[in-house]
From Swiss-Prot:
The gene is Sp24D. Highest level of adult expression is in the thorax. Belongs to the peptidase S1 family. The lineage of its organism: Eukaryota, Metazoa, Ecdysozoa, Arthropoda, Hexapoda. This is Serine protease SP24D. The keyword Signal applies. Residues 23-49 form a propeptide.
Length: 271
């Protein structure tokens, strides 16, 4: 594939992105800081959901939350304690600046964005080494705890690596295919863990990342950023980016949760 064949992106990013197998795009609906600090409007539609898959039932993913800004879906996230949400770092940036906590509302407890329990955010904490698609995780501390129920429940963090070939479940809201209609309902799909070497070759990132593949026209898409990948009721990944386009044959990049457990626990203890 030549650069001319790829979706156009900021010129400042091309030198870095040419090192990998395809052009990477964050999965949020906001404009992101690209490698080198340049900004560009991604050539993708605003709004997205898991490509393919099925509509979730109430209580099926009690850890899943949505992040709203201006009453519009921005990203997903996972409840890991009653007052803490784990999401992607690029979900909490506007250009090079971290967005105010007051601009984010977290919705939990329903597969419908029109329902559920809403909580204001007290504190936004992106990983201090986030950049160039690396360390793409952030914590949100809620102003008030979320009540525990059959529909709202924190998920455990995976503390060990996930074997290649394992099947995970990914979930999120938005469009079911590139350019398709937006849904108000949470969707989920299955994906397969890629071997670490294959992940590195596809992304150019050697640490802190886990890659998943799905059949063509399945997988994560813009708007699913920050959302979970789970295995055996444990959170194993945080949605970060896609390569080339939604539902492509290329692997999707997720932050590897086991690599960030120490950072997560240390950060939460500080507040």
């Amino acid at each position: 594939m030549t650069l001319a064949d790829r979706v156009p992106l900021a010129l400042a990013a091309l030198a870095y992105l040419a090192l990998v197998s395809g052009v990477r795009f964050h999965l949020s609906e906001q404009n992101d800081v690209l490698p080198g600090g340049s900004q560009a409007r991604r050539p993708f539609f605003q709004g997205a959901r898991i490509v393919g898959g099925s509509v979730a039932s109430e209580g099926q993913f009690p850890h899943q939350v949505a992040l709203l800004r201006g009453n519009a879906l921005t990203c997903g996230g996972s409840l890991i304690e009653s007052r803490w949400v784990l999401t992607a770092a690029h979900c909490v940036y506007n250009g090079a600046l971290v967005v105010p906590a007051s601009s984010i509302v977290v919705v939990a407890g329903s597969v419908s964005l029109s329902n559920g329990v809403r909580r204001a955010v007290a504190r936004v904490i992106p990983h201090e080494r986030y950049g160039n698609f690396k360390n793409d995780v952030a914590l949100l501390q809620l102003q008030l705890s979320l009540p525990s129920s059959a529909y709202i429940r924190p998920i455990a963090l995976r503390t060990t690596s996930v074997p290649a070939g394992s099947e995970v479940v990914i979930s999120g809201w938005g469009r079911m295919y590139q350019g398709g209609p937006v849904s108000n309902m949470l969707r989920y799909n299955r994906a397969t863990v890629v071997a670490d070497q294959q992940c590195r070759m596809a992304t150019g990132i050697s640490t802190g990342l886990i890659c998943f593949t799905s059949p063509v026209n399945n997988g994560a898409c813009n708007g699913d950023s920050g959302g979970p990948a789970i295995l055996n009721n444990q959170l194993v990944g945080v949605a970060n980016f896609i390569i080339n386009y939604c539902g492509s044959a290329s692997p999707d990049g997720y932050a590897r949760v086991s690599d960030f457990v120490t950072w997560i626990q240390t950060t939460m203890r500080r507040y």
